[in-house]
């Protein structure tokens, strides 16, 4: 049995010094550290390599979590947003491959949180989400990503997969 924890347990922001948390979770006896996807597109290849090497030195497996922003919603009714989302995920998955992360979890099928102040197309969002996840699966497999973990949210955060 392996045990892991999300770096954000100790953070108030969606970014942090992942090297610090690699050391911290290693000292605490964890095997896995989940980091946020959001900052990874800003990392250089050298920074990605350093992160991978540090995790390997500490015997920590990295995984990634993501609450997709509106502009990365693969279920959006706007085809340009869906295209942008697929481009974002393609880049993200390539970066995940560089750090050795083979699992990403989150509301990958939509966005987080959903904006209920605007009209919601539940059936369309569901159908586009399924279509988008099929595309994400192909991209992920090309990048060595083994698990696309779909997070169920509460009903106030999303309507596609929720706990209601």
Where are these regions (language model features)?
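Basic- and aromatic-lined ligand-binding clefts that recognize polyanionic substrates
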Residues: 141-164
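Flexible loop residues that form catalytic
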Residues: 38, 109, 153
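A short acidic, helix-capping loop that chelates divalent metal ions and anchors anionic groups
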Residues: 70-76, 112-117, 156-157
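Mobile beta-alpha loop/short-helix "lid" or hinge segments that flank ligand
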Residues: 69-70, 101-114, 143-146
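Conserved beta-strand positions
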Residues: 33-35, 106, 150
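Short, electropositive alpha-helical surface patch
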Residues: 52, 56, 61, 116-128, ...
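N-terminal pre-domain/capping segments
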Residues: 1-101, 127-130, 134-135, 141
């Amino acid at each position: 049995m392996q045990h892991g924890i999300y770096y954000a347990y100790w953070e108030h922001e969606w970014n942090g010094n992942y090297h610090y948390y690699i050391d911290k979770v290693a000292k605490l006896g964890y095997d896995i550290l989940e980091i946020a996807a959001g900052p990874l597109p800003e990392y250089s290849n050298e920074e990605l390599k350093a992160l991978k090497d540090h995790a390997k030195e500490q015997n920590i497996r990295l995984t990634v979590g993501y609450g997709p922003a509106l502009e990365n919603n693969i279920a959006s009714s706007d085809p340009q947003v869906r295209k942008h989302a697929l481009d974002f995920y393609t880049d993200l998955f390539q970066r995940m491959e560089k750090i050795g992360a083979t699992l990403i979890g989150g509301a990958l099928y939509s966005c987080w949180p959903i904006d209920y102040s605007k009209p919601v197309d539940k059936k369309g969002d569901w159908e586009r989400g399924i279509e988008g996840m099929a595309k994400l699966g192909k991209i992920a497999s090309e990048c060595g990503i083994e698990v696309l973990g779909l997070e169920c949210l509460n009903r106030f955060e999303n309507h596609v997969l929720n706990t209601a």
